[in-house]
Each structure stands twice: as structure tokens, then as C-alpha cells.
Curated annotation (Swiss-Prot):
The gene is gpmA. PANTHER family: PHOSPHOGLYCERATE MUTASE. This is 2,3-bisphosphoglycerate-dependent phosphoglycerate mutase. Substrate binds at residues 9-16, 22-23, 61, 88-91, 99, 115-116, 159-160. It comes from Brucella anthropi (strain ATCC 49188 / DSM 6882 / CCUG 24695 / JCM 21032 / LMG 3331 / NBRC 15819 / NCTC 12168 / Alc 37) (Ochrobactrum anthropi). Belongs to the phosphoglycerate mutase family. BPG-dependent PGAM subfamily. Keywords: Gluconeogenesis, Glycolysis, Isomerase.
Length: 206
């Protein structure tokens, strides 16, 4: 049985390039971002993977990444579920701000705490812990059952929503997950055991 879960962070967005806090705002992909998403599809194709179902967020940068991947695999019409449970962490009042401007307004130390602490949210926004509190139950109830049935499942989402998933899958502490970087457009391939524990993990770097 396959029992394969593939996580892909969306390709570079226009706001990644401009150094802006994005969160639930909805900028498109850059030219590089489109290329990263297509390259992710090519790497998955080279690995011999085909999907049974795909999941993505309610935000276009993840949806377009998902579609590019499926197009590269010749699976353009695959059933794809879109749900805001997989959305990026909501940065609240920081959304749309340049990160340097935010540091000037609130101070470098405070912005660093908001960005890199596990359970301190920015004003009006979510912490990584809050993000995990919506992502992990969605995974357990909606995504994982497909994987455990032996299917190969794609989740195309965002840096922090995927970090919340990886934290739970890998059994990481808050301190460990905060040090983990997730590059845009790089597939992370998990194979699960029948009891839902991780049998193997592979990162398909370029």
C-alpha cells in the first residue's frame, strides 16, 4: 500500500518578493513562483508519484501551485479540495506590512517574538500554535483517512500551516519547529505506517 503524503509550500509569491507579511491576503505567484511550482511537479513525476486526491487552501498562491503540480503529472482534472483550514497563519495587523516597516513601528525584538515564538500572536492574528489548532484536526479528520486507505495525497499549502503539520507528524517540540525552514516549491514526501506513524520522510530538493 502506498500511504503517501506529499506536502508542498506554494511557489514564491509577489509579497514574498517584496518582503511583506502575507497571511490571509491573496497575492499571486511571481514568475519564479510559477517556475518553482512546475519544477515541484517535475520532481514528483521523476519520483514516479501519482495522486489520488489533492488538498489546498482557500488562497490562490497555493491553489495555483497545486494546479501546476497536477498539470505536470498529467492529472489536471484530479479532485482537489480547497479549505481555509489549510490557510497560512493569519498575521493580523501585520498583514500587508513590509517587515522592515513593522520593525520600525513595534521594534525589532517584538516583531521577532511575533514571527518566531510558538504561542505569541501578533495583534489581531494567530500564533503558530493557533494555526496548528485548525490545521492538525483538519488533517486528522479529512486528509489522513485517505492516506491510511493506501492513497497518495497532495497537500499544497503555506509555510506555517505546513510547519504545524510537520511538527505533529515528526513529533517536534516548539523549539525545534521554530528552527525549521520550509523552502518554496520543494516537495516533502512522507510514507506512513498503518498506525499513522511516519515510516519515512524524503525532501525532493532540486
Amino acid at each position: 500500500m502506498s500511504r503517501t503524503l506529499v506536502l508542498v509550500r506554494h511557489g514564491q509569491s509577489e509579497w514574498n518578493l517584496k518582503n511583506l507579511f502575507t497571511g490571509w491576503r491573496d497575492p499571486g505567484l511571481t514568475e519564479q513562483g510559477h517556475a518553482e511550482a512546475k519544477a515541484a511537479g517535475q520532481r514528483l513525476k521523476a519520483a514516479g508519484l501519482k495522486f489520488d486526491i489533492a488538498y489546498t487552501s482557500a488562497l490562490s498562491r497555493a491553489q495555483v501551485t497545486c494546479q501546476h503540480i497536477l498539470d505536470q503529472l498529467g492529472q489536471s482534472d484530479l479532485k482537489t479540495i480547497r479549505d481555509q483550514a489549510l490557510n497560512e497563519r493569519d498575521y493580523g495587523d501585520l498583514s500587508g506590512l513590509n517587515k522592515d516597516d513593522a520593525r520600525a513601528k513595534w521594534g525589532e525584538e517584538q516583531v521577532h517574538i511575533w514571527r518566531r515564538s510558538y504561542d505569541v500572536p501578533p495583534p489581531g492574528g494567530e500564533s503558530l500554535k493557533d494555526t496548528g489548532a485548525r490545521v492538525w484536526p483538519y488533517y486528522l479528520h479529512t486528509v489522513q483517512p485517505h492516506v491510511l486507505r493506501g492513497e497518495t495525497v497532495l497537500v499544497a499549502a503555506h509555510g506555517n500551516s505546513l510547519r504545524a503539520l510537520i511538527m505533529a507528524l515528526d513529533g517536534l517540540t516548539p523549539e525545534q519547529i521554530l528552527k525549521q525552514e520550509l523552502n518554496t516549491g520543494v516537495p516533502v514526501v512522507y510514507r506512513l505506517n498503518a498506525d499513522s506513524t511516519v515510516a519515512s520522510k524524503e525532501i525532493l530538493e532540486a
